[in-house]
Structure formats: structure tokens, C-alpha cells
Regions:
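Flexible "cap/lid" subdomain of the alpha/beta-hydrolase fold that forms the substrate-access gate
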Residues: 2, 8-9, 22-24, 30, ...
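Short acidic-hydrophobic surface loop/beta-edge motif
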Residues: 11-17
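A broad, low-specificity signal marking well-ordered, structured residues that form hydrophobic/aromatic
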Residues: 13, 22, 40
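Short beta-strand element of the alpha/beta-hydrolase
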Residues: 35-44
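Non-catalytic, surface-exposed connector residues within folded enzymatic/regulatory domains
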Residues: 36, 53, 187-190
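The serine-hydrolase catalytic nucleophile loop
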Residues: 44-56
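Alpha-helical interaction/dimerization surfaces of two-component signaling modules
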Residues: 55-58, 97
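A generic structural motif
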Residues: 60-65
């Protein structure tokens, strides 16, 4: 998570995909930028585009940067109620968004769970994909990572996502290795935590998170 929330985007919008609407933001550059100058960012579990704050602030001076919010628990637009939120479906949705948002090609950048989504998106060989950049991320045989793997199973218990939301309001819980303790290098400020936790107030967002987690364990 960056020290500051993302800078003001040049343009924001919503793109339609097979799983529903995805919110996107763009920074710097131009939609007419060549594929090697277009960067598409995919975040991880229980984060959203705000995780890329300082990254897009720096890179948007030389690149056209697009951040995409996918339904991993801190998104603000719930997926379609009938959407299958397997990682493969998320990857398809990313490629559908890229086709519409990156007409001249793109470099796909994924971190954490977004890295797995990006790997599967690349395997589908979208026409516009120029490069794949994987930051610290999950892999097929380490997904979810062991400290967080319990989430794949407790997601089957009714009310767990609501309980997770309540627990994440407690600082000592957030600092546990089975929460964010090993994922952040410093204590996030109130605005950053709010960006992560507040979307879970929406029952649709909680439903989506549970679907994704159940999909991992199948």
C-alpha cells in the first residue's frame, strides 16, 4: 500500500465485462499511446486501485497508466449477482476491459492475488498484450499463501465476511500475520484503511469476496 492514496486521475470511468462493471482510472499519457507506453495495473485481495498510489504518480510522467478495480473485497461496484468469480473468470474480465481501454496494446502488471489473475489473463493470449510484469504475487501452488489460506474455507460459513469486516476495524487484528501484518511495512493511515474496509459495508461486495474465496478452494 502506498504512503498516499492515488493522485487525481485524468479520467475515471466504468467498463462493462462478463462479470459486470469494473471501475477504472487513468493517469498521464493519452489513450492513443503506443502499447509499450500503456500500463494496466491489477491489484490483490482486499485492496483496490489505491494500492498503486505512488507507483502511478511516478510512472504517469512517462507512461499512460490505467488502474482497474476488480471484485476482490475492496471494490465499490459489486459484480453481477449471477457472475462466476473464479480466478479464470476474473482474468477473462481483465482481458475484456483491456480490449476496450487499451486499443493499442498494453503491459499487464499484477501484484498479490492480482498477479495470479494476470498470469491467467496472459495465458489466454489477449491480442493487445505486449508484456507481463509480476510483482510479489501468488502462484498456482501457493494460492492463497499459507497465512491467509484459512479464508478459502471460512468463506463457506455464513456471516464470516461480515465478521471479517468488523475484525478489520481493530488495529491489533490488522497487524496479525493472518491479516495484514506481513503485507504492509508500516501502519497505514485512517484514509488508507478506510479504502480497504469501507467497501465491505456493501452486502454485494461481501458476497463477491466470499465467491472469490470459495472459487480458490475448488
Amino acid at each position: 500500500m502506498s504512503r498516499n492514496l492515488t493522485p487525481e486521475p485524468v479520467v475515471t470511468g466504468i467498463v462493462e465485462t462478463r462479470i459486470g462493471q469494473l471501475r477504472w482510472r487513468e493517469y498521464g499519457g493519452s489513450r492513443e499511446a503506443a502499447g509499450d507506453k500503456t500500463l494496466l495495473f491489477v491489484h490483490g485481495l482486499l485492496t483496490n486501485s489505491d494500492v498503486w498510489g505512488e507507483v502511478v504518480q511516478d510512472l504517469s510522467q512517462d507512461f499512460w497508466c490505467i488502474t482497474l478495480d476488480i471484485p476482490l473485497g475492496s471494490h465499490t461496484i459489486p459484480a453481477r449477482e449471477d457472475a462466476s468469480l473464479t480466478v479464470a473468470e476474473l482474468a477473462q474480465a481483465v482481458n475484456e476491459a483491456a480490449e476496450q481501454l487499451c486499443p493499442h496494446g498494453f503491459t499487464l502488471i499484477g501484484s498479490d492475488t492480482g498477479g495470479v489473475v494476470s498470469q491467467l489473463a496472459a495465458v489466454q493470449e489477449p491480442a493487445g498484450l505486449k508484456r507481463l510484469v509480476l510483482l510479489s504475487c501468488d502462484t498456482e501452488k501457493n494460492f492463497l499463501p499459507l497465512p491467509l489460506r484459512y479464508l478459502q474455507y471460512v468463506a463457506y460459513i455464513p456471516g464470516t465476511m461480515q465478521a471479517l469486516r468488523a475484525a478489520l476495524h481493530l488495529g491489533w487484528v490488522r497487524r496479525l500475520p493472518i491479516a495484514f501484518g506481513w503485507l504492509v511495512k508500516r501502519e497505514l493511515d485512517a484514509a488508507e484503511w478506510n479504502s480497504i474496509i469501507a467497501p465491505l459495508k456493501d452486502a454485494g461486495v461481501r458476497r463477491d469476496l466470499a465467491k472469490v474465496l470459495k472459487g480458490i478452494s475448488t
